[in-house]
Amino acid sequence: MMRFKRTVSRRALSAKIAGAFWAVMFAGMTSYGTGLFDVAAKDNDVVTLRVCNWEEYIDEGDWDDDETIELPEGDIIGVNPMYKDFEQWYYDTYHQKVKVEYSCFGTNEELYNMLSLGNEYDVVCPSEYMIMKLMAEDQLVPFSDTFFDESVDENYYIKGVSPFIRNAFETNEINGETWSKYAAGYMWGVTGIVYNPQEVSKEDASTWNILTDKRYFRRVTIKDNVRDAYFAAVGAIKGDLLTSDDFINDPDYHQNLATEMNDLSPENLEEALDYLQKSRDNVYSFETDSGKADMMSGKVVAGYQWSGDAVYTLDQAEEDDFYLNFAVPKESTNLYFDGWVMLKKGIQDDAKKQQAAEAFINFVSRPDNAVRNMYYIGYTSVISGGDDNTVFDYLDYNYGVDDESEDVDVMEYPLGYFFSGDADDPDYVLITDSEQAERQLGAQYPSDDVMNRSAVMRYFDTEENAAVNRMWIEVRCYNIKNVPAYIWVVVVVAVIAAIAVLIRGKIVERSMKRK
């Protein structure tokens, strides 16, 4: 095994690519599988597949030769954008022309607005709460039975998705229907705190209360969106309950944790408002993307981050010999997913289009392609690989060390929960530097202990969304209720004085005209 052959993700090296459309055509024809996909073999029509994904969220290719990832299963290198490689693979595999129109969005809300304004896509990749919303609104096409057939060689998703992720998708429901019926995972992660260990202790970084900790006045950042901010607030205000032995040892702990972290009662909203207003007065900034740069520049010593962005931040800082850590709050962490779904308005009962859409999802889920995407963007794929060890070998390629290394404090880092579904599986124990438990490895693949205290934040219905947004407006706008009385007196006096000066000026002006 090699020590930290990890390099900075390609995302850190590439220019921002947003809203671009790419397409390549190849000749051919096919039929796929059985059942739903008995497509006419002699149909020469080109299938146009419209895919909309997050910005910088798929391998765009153009790797240098020295970026080649050398694994036991073979070398991996990205030459072309993955969606172009899919077109060629689809033709080679199914002998059918397909043209991919690839475009991007910046936020879930932007995607939803695009759909509401009439933009039509076949496959999109929203986050879990937007998937839930689209399911509730009956906007999605369910996967075919063929998609779940593990005997089909090309069904890389169902054969390779992590047992941990698969369980989450099969046990969470909207209106009595599981996520897995409509969504296939793509990337996943947790939320936590990136911090400078020279300035902040691990203990301080391991609680959501750091956002209001006066010792870090104007030296910590918080996410500038209501969902992430509200989750942190709930974790902080319910901290004593969530970390109590009685709560943790309850047989229904996970269900209770999800209930508490999704508490949208008026009382909880009021407490969250108070906490977030205190946070606003303490943090350096509310941010969406600038927090990474602020951490790397030293403007702040801690920042609320998604684990994928945490890996990017740690990578970039390390390039300058500046070492940061990642901690997951003890109260709870938000388990998030981005996943592929098919839209009714795009697919429109077109069997050939659905065939291509499901094949695209399978293609990006092939273990070597999962590695390409992880390397390029820095986030963690939901793919563990099943019987294919490519993903675990890539993990070892990045973080593995020789267990006899004398210059490294070596530890065993068990990852069976993700790769096989058995937390104690000896086949999936990584030998690594102990520091990595609190650095990139711990962010990319959190420990089983961390995942045990994770919770999925569900989507807000119309009424809940209105209530949460009202609360958020009070957080982000200046709260006049907190203005001291003496300030109001000064304001009133100033207004009266200004009016008096104005009136006096008018009187003088009139008297001058009379003269």
Predicted segment positions?
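Mature extracytoplasmic/periplasmic domains
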Residues: 342-445, 484
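Extracytoplasmic ligand-binding site segments that recognize negatively charged/polar headgroups
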Residues: 50-66, 74-79, 129-282, 286-296
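Extracytoplasmic/periplasmic substrate-binding proteins
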Residues: 281-349
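Early extracytoplasmic/lumenal segment of secretory-pathway proteins
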Residues: 37-133, 137
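Conserved C-terminal helix/tail region of periplasmic/extracytoplasmic solute-binding proteins
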Residues: 419-515
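Gram-positive cell-envelope targeting signals
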Residues: 1-41, 477-515
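Short beta-strand and adjacent tight-turn residues that come in two discontinuous sequence segments
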Residues: 105, 125-126, 222, 286-287, ...
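Short helices/loops that flank or line small-molecule/ion binding pockets
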Residues: 84, 109-121, 136-137, 210, ...
